[in-house]
């Protein structure tokens, strides 16, 4: 949990109970503070408080989803960071409203419950699956939108001209024109364009989060060594792809690893074998300039969940035994926990090209199909100031908590952030990665 609560202390012989002032907020690196102020218009304390508020709301939403399934209609932070809980008409609405107000949250009356939206989501999936290929090719993705209380179906601009019309029974679906994005990195790979595929599966699940916390590896809050390798630092995969390190951690056998993006590995089929892709420091290894190697890809996944596990060579393992992320050459940010994505929550991403850039989450549990190369399912979308090729695999945080790994963006050809504009970044939730690899852990305080 980010932040602290006041502690009640009784001094020997004292007649009064005194409240100790709250501890100061964790110190944030200057590069991150600048990004928070520039991109979010928040102070560091406001950013940390809003991130914590979001995680508290996630846990409350999980309990509401289980206790009041007939009326619960989603939860989010509004533009001012106010926690909102949607409620639809149902036999349990009065009790649900009492629970929301008792928790100090605001209620928004909505027309459809989350359960009804999930049912419509399944019908939409079936409808897309049965479309002829010349029409399904214009569908780019879909997700439940708790704020608008509907389903956002994203298509390309040519969809309506090709006769793509929603049937009457899909009454909760809102069509949005525009591509869902393309691969934002690696820098030496040609940009990947999106193609179509059903944006949802036949078996729909509630957009809930795992209430039991995944295991973490605890480390002491000590500053990193001068030669330490941190999340956000650049690396090269066999000289073919330049990416960013993600979160440091350990695997099921206790080996030191770094968790990055799966599509950064150009030979993913060889992961975990003697022919596995070698990871090199920096982004200049091209076969002629040999920067030092630091590990090999032990596991690579690009289908549905985009992640890689880079097993660190024993000779340099000590350099990765830390829980920090940063922009290359900058001061470190300690990772203190693991978080869930929530619409409206503040996020900041670190990458070796764009550095720290911040924004808010606009979608959760979204599916994105990128050519024949990879598919993202249950990804979250953050609208951030800038994302550049080379940022893939880098860490996405909310507050000081690990949230996800950068996977794709909709500005793959942007060269720099000099004329930065807000862009969408798709990220794979860190909890989805840990669930897909038993025993994998993220280092935290």
Name each region found by the language model.
Residues 398-445:
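C-terminal subregion of chymotrypsin/trypsin-like serine protease catalytic domains
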Residues 187-219:
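Extracellular mucin-like PTS domains
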Residues 99-100, 109-186, 220-259, 297:
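Non-catalytic extracellular/periplasmic "stalk"
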Residues 27, 31-34, 38, 48-49, ...:
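Short glycine/threonine-rich beta-strand-turn micro-motifs
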Residues 227-368, 397-399, 403:
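Serine endopeptidase catalytic core focused on the charge-relay Asp
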Residues 259-268, 315, 373-390:
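Short solvent-exposed strand/turn elements
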Residues 1-21:
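Secretory targeting and sorting signals
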Residues 359-384, 392-393, 411:
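Helical hairpin unit composed of two closely spaced alpha helices linked by a short loop
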């Amino acid at each position: 949990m980010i932040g602290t609560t006041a502690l009640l202390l009784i001094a020997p012989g004292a007649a009064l109970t005194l409240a100790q002032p709250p501890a100061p907020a964790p110190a944030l690196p200057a590069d991150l503070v600048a990004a928070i102020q520039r991109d979010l218009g928040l102070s560091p304390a406001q950013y940390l408080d809003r991130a914590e508020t979001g995680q508290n709301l996630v846990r409350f939403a999980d309990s509401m989803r289980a206790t009041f399934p007939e009326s619960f209609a989603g939860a989010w932070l509004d533009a001012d960071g106010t926690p909102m809980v949607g409620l639809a008409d149902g036999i349990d609405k009065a009790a649900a409203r009492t629970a929301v107000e008792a928790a100090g949250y605001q209620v928004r009356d909505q027309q459809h419950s989350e359960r009804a939206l999930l049912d419509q989501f399944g019908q939409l999936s079936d409808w897309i699956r049965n479309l002829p290929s010349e029409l399904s090719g214009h569908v780019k993705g879909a997700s439940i939108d708790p704020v608008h209380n509907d389903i956002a179906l994203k298509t390309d601009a040519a969809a309506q001209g090709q006769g793509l019309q929603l049937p009457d029974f899909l009454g909760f679906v809102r069509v949005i024109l525009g591509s869902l994005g393309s691969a934002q990195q690696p820098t030496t790979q040609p940009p990947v364009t999106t193609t179509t595929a059903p944006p949802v599966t036949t078996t729909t699940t509630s957009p809930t989060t795992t209430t039991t916390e995944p295991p973490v590896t605890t480390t002491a809050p000590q500053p990193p060594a001068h030669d330490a390798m941190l999340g956000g630092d650049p690396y090269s995969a066999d000289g073919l792809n330049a990416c960013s390190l993600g979160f440091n951690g350990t695997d099921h056998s206790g080996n030191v690893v770094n968790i990055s993006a799966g599509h950064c590995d150009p030979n993913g089929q060889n992961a975990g074998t003697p022919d596995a892709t070698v990871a090199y420091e920096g982004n200049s290894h091209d076969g002629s300039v040999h920067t030092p190697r630091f590990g090999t890809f032990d596991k690579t996944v690009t289908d549905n969940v985009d992640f890689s596990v880079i097993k660190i060579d024993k000779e340099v393992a000590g350099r990765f035994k830390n829980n920090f992320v940063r922009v290359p050459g900058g001061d470190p940010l300690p990772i203190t926990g693991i978080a869930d994505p929530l619409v409206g929550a503040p996020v900041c991403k670190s990458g070796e090209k764009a550095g720290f850039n911040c924004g808010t989450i606009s979608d959760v549990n979204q599916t994105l199909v990128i050519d024949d190369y990879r598919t993202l399912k249950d990804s979250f979308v953050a609208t951030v100031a800038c994302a550049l090729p080379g940022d893939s695999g880098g860490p996405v945080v909310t507050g000081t908590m690990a949230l996800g790994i950068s996977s794709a963006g909709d500005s793959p050809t942007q060269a720099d952030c000099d004329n930065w504009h807000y862009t969408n970044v798709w990220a794979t939730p860190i909890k989805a990665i840990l669930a897909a690899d038993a025993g994998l852990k993220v280092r935290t305080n």
